[in-house]
Amino acid sequence: MSGSRFERELEFVQLLCNPDYLRWLTREGHFESEEFRSYLRYLEYWRSPEYSRFLTYPQCLAVLEHLNSENINDMLSDENFFLALGEQQYFIWLNKHKEGWNK
């Protein structure tokens, strides 16, 4: 793996915004692994301002919050979760150039 631990974790936490990647993680059984679930909890440090300022896609923190919730298995078994996430991402990317779009 190339890059520092910081760079790898920055890239990974932002990949959580990608519904296709989340589908793949689900199909591969990663969310059934306690080690993986612990890693997701560890990534909560990205919420602190000293780290979150580096995020290009800060909405990944909302996804991370969902992934660390008790009912995540129910959410991941529902295709509507992935569809809604994809629609939200599209809307964010579509409107990001507009001043004050997220206020």
UniProtKB/Swiss-Prot annotation:
InterPro entries: Med31_sf (IPR038089), Mediator_Med31 (IPR008831). One of its GO terms (cellular component) is mediator complex. The keyword rRNA-binding does not apply. Its main location: nucleus. Pfam families: Med31 (PF05669). GO terms for molecular function: transcription coregulator activity. The keyword Isomerase does not apply. Keywords: Activator, Nucleus, Transcription, Transcription regulation. It is found in: Nucleus. GO terms for biological process: regulation of DNA-templated transcription. PANTHER family: MEDIATOR OF RNA POLYMERASE II TRANSCRIPTION SUBUNIT 31. Component of the Mediator complex, a coactivator involved in the regulated transcription of nearly all RNA polymerase II-dependent genes. Mediator functions as a bridge to convey information from gene-specific regulatory proteins to the basal RNA polymerase II transcription machinery. Mediator is recruited to promoters by direct interactions with regulatory proteins and serves as a scaffold for the assembly of a functional preinitiation complex with RNA polymerase II and the general transcription factors. Belongs to the Mediator complex subunit 31 family. Component of the Mediator complex. This is Mediator of RNA polymerase II transcription subunit 31.
